[in-house]
């Protein structure tokens, strides 16, 4: 007569409370489970099954069943004496079935606050017969989340009114960065995505010789975003024609986390630098007392007529008669890559240290802020009538190409 084995499974909740034992092991603990009766020509094999509490599930390669061996060890066939673990089960309950129908399992990917889906599909994936999650538009390619740009939580109020400018409300200019040179000179930079910023070539060359390279410059800079959040610089890239196009890019070692204090500004798909259009410029530059400010300020400035701006800085009313004269003793770069913005009606203006900041324009239809220009000439300080900005649309191809290659 063949031997007959019997298995007793004790259901346990996340941990082993007690086990029964045969003749060779200790008697049962006082959990109320009776000792099983013996049978002729057979024996009792002691085993337990680990189970988890509600909303938890087993994390194990085995089935959770452990058998007591001759050495009084609890052993699982798949994992030996390694105990299973319980982990949170965030799965959905099985939906009820319907007559003449079936349940199609699908999930929708969504992004956290201040991020949006970057995908050709709608983010909805369906489980196919091969147990693969498939999107109708992109197949098994997963979507990505990218930073929202140009959507400040507390946008600047035009009713509120850096030279004598207005204090920034919380998060009005989350793209504004503060850059400090190795000789402790403060300038500006503008966040345009999670890892790249625009600034001027002049800012990058501060206290460096003309022979300095991008590799020489990067280690000498200190950069802050948000509320004095220090970020590490990986490299700087100068525009190939930076003597005429006063611009450079900064790449960070790590992507920044986007939130209400840190958010890139959008790059425009059209030119917003129309005469009379008002933009906002923020910065930590010098104030009316010619001292650097500890508080981010901003000012509203109108785009000026380019010809008038050129005549103003040439010191002549006739454009053909070029002279080195300038109301502030320094000649700005003025060409097809630049535009000018005049002082506000309150005689407010940008000043030393504001260069690298964005001329931010609010597109009311899209409710989005765009970097129309990057402040290049910040020496006006309410003495000259115009500040000079590098036009972002004229450098956008270079910006996108540089980011893609680096």
From Swiss-Prot:
Record domain Peptidase S1: where: 162-404
Tissue: Expressed by the liver and secreted in plasma.
Transmembrane parts of this sequence: none
InterPro entries registered for this protein in UniProt: Peptidase_S1_PA (IPR009003), Peptidase_S1_PA_chymotrypsin (IPR043504), Peptidase_S1A (IPR001314), Sushi/SCR/CCP_sf (IPR035976), Sushi_SCR_CCP_dom (IPR000436), Trypsin_dom (IPR001254)
GO molecular function terms listed in the Swiss-Prot or TrEMBL record: antioxidant activity; hemoglobin binding; serine-type endopeptidase activity
Chief site of localization: secreted
GO cellular component, one term: extracellular region
Domain (Sushi) ranges: 31-88, 90-147
Glycosylated sites: 184, 207, 211, 241
The keyword Repeat is assigned to this record: yes
Signal peptide limits: 1-18
PANTHER family referenced in this protein's UniProt entry, alphabetically: COMPLEMENT COMPONENT 1, S SUBCOMPONENT-RELATED (PTHR24255), HAPTOGLOBIN (PTHR24255:SF30)
Function description: As a result of hemolysis, hemoglobin is found to accumulate in the kidney and is secreted in the urine. Haptoglobin captures, and combines with free plasma hemoglobin to allow hepatic recycling of heme iron and to prevent kidney damage. Haptoglobin also acts as an antioxidant, has antibacterial activity, and plays a role in modulating many aspects of the acute phase response. Hemoglobin/haptoglobin complexes are rapidly cleared by the macrophage CD163 scavenger receptor expressed on the surface of liver Kupfer cells through an endocytic lysosomal degradation pathway. The uncleaved form of allele alpha-2 (2-2), known as zonulin, plays a role in intestinal permeability, allowing intercellular tight junction disassembly, and controlling the equilibrium between tolerance and immunity to non-self antigens.
Record: disease: Anhaptoglobinemia: A condition characterized by the absence of the serum glycoprotein haptoglobin. Serum levels of haptoglobin vary among normal persons: levels are low in the neonatal period and in the elderly, differ by population, and can be influenced by environmental factors, such as infection. Secondary hypohaptoglobinemia can occur as a consequence of hemolysis, during which haptoglobin binds to free hemoglobin. Congenital haptoglobin deficiency is a risk factor for anaphylactic non-hemolytic transfusion reactions.
Subunit annotation: Tetramer of two alpha and two beta chains; disulfide-linked. The hemoglobin/haptoglobin complex is composed of a haptoglobin dimer bound to two hemoglobin alpha-beta dimers. Interacts with CD163. Interacts with ERGIC3.
Protein name listed in UniProt: Haptoglobin
